Swiss-Prot record:
Reaction catalysis annotation: sn-glycerol 3-phosphate + NAD(+) = dihydroxyacetone phosphate + NADH + H(+)
Function: Has glycerol-3-phosphate dehydrogenase activity.
Protein name per its UniProtKB record: Glycerol-3-phosphate dehydrogenase [NAD(+)], cytoplasmic
GO cellular component, one term: cytosol
Protein keywords: Cytoplasm, NAD, Oxidoreductase, Phosphoprotein
This protein's record includes keyword Oxidoreductase: yes
Protein family (similarity comment): Belongs to the NAD-dependent glycerol-3-phosphate dehydrogenase family.
Subcellular location: Cytoplasm
Name of the gene encoding the protein in the UniProt record: Gpd1
Organismal lineage: Eukaryota, Metazoa, Chordata, Craniata, Vertebrata
Catalytic machinery residues: K204
Database matches in PANTHER family: GLYCEROL-3-PHOSPHATE DEHYDROGENASE, GLYCEROL-3-PHOSPHATE DEHYDROGENASE [NAD(+)], CYTOPLASMIC
Residues annotated for substrate binding in this entry: K120, R269, N270
Binding site for NAD(+): G10, S11, G12, N13, W14, G15, A153, R269, K296, Q298
Oligomer and partners: Homodimer.
Amino acid sequence: MAGKKVCIVGSGNWGSAIAKIVGSNASQLAHFDPRVTMWVFEEDIGGRKLTEIINTQHENVKYLPGHKLPPNVVAVPDVVQAATGADILVFVVPHQFIGKICDQLKGHLKANTIGISLIKGIDEGPNGLKLISEVIGESLGIPMSVLMGANIASEVAEEKFCETTIGCKDPAQGQLLKELMQTPNFRITVVQEVDTVEICGALKNIVAVGAGFCDGLGFGDNTKAAVIRLGLMEMIAFAKLFCSGSVSSATFLESCGVADLITTCYGGRNRKVAEAFARTGKSIEQLEKEMLNGQKLQGPQTARELHSILQHKGLVDKFPLFTAVYKVCYEGQPVGEFICCLQNHPEHM
């Protein structure tokens, strides 16, 4: 029987780190096709195409420099061509681009394709919250799983030990995806609460912006710990309000929950840029250009989408930390007033 074909949709920092793992595993495991395609948004790097550089030097020199990709990972600049014939699609692009990509892929996938989203973010639907995996699943008519965890891309690429969580409703699919992605240093737990796993991945970026504000304002470790805890409480409260399936507190103790929250609040780009925002007074857009090579920050954008949903439901007051991050990023509230928003938190009433 032919091995299952895998396509990675996306090739940024995290997409390239995952390509390293998937490419290596696919080349060694009999039930996967060794050739892994990776859709690359074509860019010009010093007069050469990025796809050409990846396919000859086996390195994403722009988004994951210094790390060799397996030679069986093939960069393809056309997303439809990359996904043609794929049995498994791994989605790992900034969440604001997913709608357009799904529109391009519609009608071009083979029957029985499955997808897994590594995208941290949420979307607004007509009835409020829309998870990215739902957007993809409904658009393409494929079953979707998610992978979220304490996974800073550069550390995963360096093969430093970490854990992650796959949310998958179908145990057989969950096992297949685990085989494709697990390594001795990238350990995977599979749970069935897909919605909760994905909500964790999106909301922790908002909390990390708050943690970055604390660092930029020099508030110290106790304050930052309080921000992280209050953020976790808001994440759980939000999940219980908005997830259609069951929400157990145990899922928040998996890598996708508390572990991802901790690593993002101490090491991630949302924290780093938010700290610079509090220190320098420069805009988020300017700091993205200066610090992230033009890549987009997920935290502020997710805060904006969330705020719109909470407003719609009349629940803004129940989520003061999420609301404070939104107001500082988009409504010109002074960052120095961030802590005032937490002094009357519902948790303390």
